[in-house]
Amino acid sequence: MVLRLSKLFLRTLREDPADAEVASHRLLVRAGYIRRAAPGIYTWLPLGLSVLRKVEKVIREEMAAIGAQEVHFPALLPKEPYEATNRWTEYGEGIFRLKDRKGGDYLLAPTHEEMFTLLVKDLYSSYKDLPLSIYQIQNKYRDEARPRAGLLRGREFIMKDSYSFDVDDAGLDASYNAHRAAYLKIFERLGLEVIPVAATAGAMGGSRSEEFLHPTEIGEDTFVRSAGGYAANVEAVTTVVPAEIDFSNAPAAEIRDTPNTPTIDTLVDAANQLVPRDENDGGAWTAADTLKNVVLAVTLPTGERQIVVIGVPGDRGVDLKRVEANIGAYLPVAGEITVEAAGEEDLARNPLIVRGYLGPGMSLGTPLLGLEGAAKLLYLVDPRVVKGTAWVTGANMAGKHVFGLVAGRDFGWDGVIECTEVRAGDEAPDGSGPLETARGIEMGHIFQLGRKYAEALELKVLDQNGKQVVVTMGSYGVGVTRAVAALAESNHDAKGLVWPRAVAPADVHVVAVGRGEEIFAAAEQLSLELEAAGLEVIYDDRPKVSPGVKFGDAELIGVPTILAVGRGLVDGVVEIKDRRSGEAENVAVEKAVDYVVNAVRSK
């Protein structure tokens, strides 16, 4: 097929869009691939659709290779299935809800677990029907509070989501591993580097979970990896827990006056003055000897705001994303939550919280937790706070701290939570070496859902013994529009996009440079011959556009090979340029088609 720029629905831009934050957003708009319709919502133009369809084609081929079958669900969904799994409430403000003229409740699909489950329940009833994997490529909708980065964080986006249905956990393992292998092939074929990392299940639920992260500095996800092969999203990293300490002979805790020490730094300075230690006692006090009690406000899916206090070593910061990922086990309702530092109003409603001198619930001073007549606050601790560890921490009285407060003797906690920042140099949980940190974009996410949705929606089949058993499920997603953005993000230079051949909107971009009829005739003939050879061709046949603009557009659009027909035609040659390397070569006209065909098929 030959796409002629004189006819193609396309306008390139010389200036960056005002709202563009990242290169992929800037270049996809400037090169005429997408146009903004509203915040987080984009229209796909012909060139953009070409790239999108090629990404989808690769996905479909690899899904077919593992026996997955394609279906297509509506994007407008009824409320009832989501009520059955409690996700109508759990999603909170994160979804688009609407009513029909009769008052019926609907939502624009954020995801389709319930619909897949009900479809299989409606059609299948025996173990003989399983295993089954089905998938769709469909629009999804999330009411993002702050859409950003173009296609990377939008309100409408396209995903491939597939689901596996098995009789038992062994079958689920096989389905999960098949999808995992297929995902690695998909990203390899697209030319997109990904790193599989351990992840949390979040609101999806289930057990085993992995993300496929594309490493890039603009990524929203932080992950860690070791030289020995460990890799995990920071939300899923588990702390190396120290051994418990025998505290039977530990000295009693002691409250001391520590005026003007509301921060860890001022507390450490005061500790070294008040209770100096020598090397035999562990050396000078450091932030790691202190227990910092951080007050957080958790907004539940219901909109209710709950105060939580978390105790962490003073040399560690709290990672709010890790808190969000792991605090669900201690909350009264499940679903997507937000966590932030408690504000002035939160603190005012809890007068027992003494800012700068907050301690855990204890028998010394004025206890925060369990105080008669006061509401109990949820108190969680970092895994490093183990029985027998002694701390310097707030005494819940202004200007006072307690020294030698022993965990498990002087104070307890409601639970343990992975919540602190993960640092480069921390030991990998599996002992495979120190961790290094990086950022990435989530390109895919796979889950072993288990029986969560099948139980809620009563998806059962008869097993070999004629007994009804609950089906076990897996969920597997790929961000299709996000893949386009990530490819643009990792394949561009100062002049424009540089698409990998697997997804480029064409194989070759032919440019007629000059105004002579013989130039346009030769460019036309070469375009037709390239098409006849099975290549996709963009042909810039615009008669009144300068060579500079044509070359600028060709480099902005980013097709891998540029063939220029110009002044060299009098010598019987055309210029063929590799867009990625920038290398150009003069090739005889009669050999140009074979040259381009070989270039396309060799990569």
From Swiss-Prot:
Principal place of residence: cytoplasm
Superkingdom of origin: Bacteria
EC number(s) stated in the UniProt entry for this protein: 6.1.1.15
GO BP of this protein: prolyl-tRNA aminoacylation
Gene Ontology MF terms in the entry: aminoacyl-tRNA deacylase activity; ATP binding; proline-tRNA ligase activity
Recorded coiled-coil stretches: none
Keyword list, A-Z: Aminoacyl-tRNA synthetase, ATP-binding, Cytoplasm, Ligase, Nucleotide-binding, Protein biosynthesis
Compartmental location: Cytoplasm
Listed InterPro entries: aa-tRNA-synt_IIb (IPR002314), aa-tRNA-synth_II (IPR006195), aa-tRNA-synth_II/BPL/LPL (IPR045864), Anticodon-bd (IPR004154), Anticodon-bd_dom_sf (IPR036621), Pro-tRNA-ligase_IIa (IPR002316), Pro-tRNA-synth_IIa_bac-type (IPR004500), Pro-tRNA-Synthase_IIa_type1 (IPR023717)
Gene Ontology CC annotations of this record: cytosol
PROSITE patterns associated with the record: AA_TRNA_LIGASE_II
Chemical reaction(s) catalysed: tRNA(Pro) + L-proline + ATP = L-prolyl-tRNA(Pro) + AMP + diphosphate
Gene3D superfamilies named in the record: Anticodon-binding domain (3.40.50.800), Bira Bifunctional Protein, Domain 2 (3.30.930.10)
Domain text: Consists of three domains: the N-terminal catalytic domain, the editing domain and the C-terminal anticodon-binding domain.
Role noted for this protein: Catalyzes the attachment of proline to tRNA(Pro) in a two-step reaction: proline is first activated by ATP to form Pro-AMP and then transferred to the acceptor end of tRNA(Pro). As ProRS can inadvertently accommodate and process non-cognate amino acids such as alanine and cysteine, to avoid such errors it has two additional distinct editing activities against alanine. One activity is designated as 'pretransfer' editing and involves the tRNA(Pro)-independent hydrolysis of activated Ala-AMP.
Database matches in PANTHER family: MITOCHONDRIAL RIBOSOME PROTEIN L39/PROLYL-TRNA LIGASE FAMILY MEMBER, PROLINE--TRNA LIGASE
Protein name: Proline--tRNA ligase
Protein source organism: Arthrobacter sp. (strain FB24)
Gene name per UniProt: proS
